[in-house]
């Protein structure tokens, strides 16, 4: 009887290409629009009027806690002093050039200025309760003006023109920092961020993993689409669970000896020839290794120490030329339920 008759029938169902929580390809955080905009009337969304909106024509509710003026043609921050209880202020996708006139909004905990024309961070000194600040997609060149925000927990500075990591000394409660799509070359000045949980540095010009020693609480690190050639400097990150290093120039898998808690390892689109030095990663669930130079089937033995491995990406490696590509992966890694973009059902 042929071997095929005794093997379990495999059904395949196409699924979407993998998506990282980090969304490091664009590192741009998406948020749903808030239902309660805190606006009574006078709303004029962007595109419905030829001239910029005069904020004085918008009747703000003084009792509103959540105010959403997303996608208006607001050119200047003004008239918000009537908001006595506001906690969340969303001014996304406007024409704002200057952070100003927010001094009286001392109850504010979240300020969203994503996608404006702001060139400098400033005038935030009185917003001491601020926990979330989004200045992504602006024209910032420096990180500054944050000294008074000691309660800040999440800071988004994606897609600006920032060339240096600096001035984080007082942000000791920061848990999430997004600096993707900037002009950074060096990882530095993060020593004080001991509570940091997630760090996103994708799409910069970083050449070395360094100066991460004090970030022992870090669970997510993304340095995708940079200029790395070596995995190093991660020995103190013992709580790291997700590591994204795709689209670099890495040649060898190494330097992960102390990262035993990794559940996701993304090394796609590098120059790696061997799967090695990861047999100790027993908690690994997702391993992305597509678009590399792996050609030896025996390398899959390195993944045998992860009984919970669910997803592997190995497409566009020399291995894929084998006619039995998928079957060999399933035999070597019986726990896997997704190979590349296809689910496997036994």
Curated annotation (Swiss-Prot):
Q: Where is the composition biased (Acidic residues)?
A: 1-13
Which ranges are annotated Basic and acidic residues under compositional bias? 14-37
- Predominant location category: nucleus
What is a single cellular component term in the Gene Ontology annotation?
nucleus
Where are the annotated segments for Disordered?
1-46
* Keywords associated with the record: Leucine-rich repeat, Nucleus, Repeat
Where the record annotates domain LRRCT, the positions are: 317-346
Gene giving rise to this polypeptide = ppp1r7
As for subcellular location, the record says: Nucleus
The entry sums up its family as follows:
Belongs to the SDS22 family.
Ranges: LRR repeats: 63-84, 85-106, 107-128, 129-150, 151-172, 173-194, 195-216, 217-238, 239-260, 261-282, 283-304
Q: What does this protein do?
A: Regulatory subunit of protein phosphatase 1.
Under the heading SMART domains, the entry gives:
LRR_SD22 (SM00365), LRR_TYP (SM00369), LRRcap (SM00446)
Q: Which organism is it from?
A: Xenopus tropicalis
List the lineage, top down. Answer: Eukaryota, Metazoa, Chordata, Craniata, Vertebrata
InterPro entries listed in its UniProt record: Cilia_flagella_integrity, Leu-rich_rpt, Leu-rich_rpt_4, Leu-rich_rpt_typical-subtyp, LRR_dom_sf, U2A'_phosphoprotein32A_C
Name of the molecule in the record: Protein phosphatase 1 regulatory subunit 7
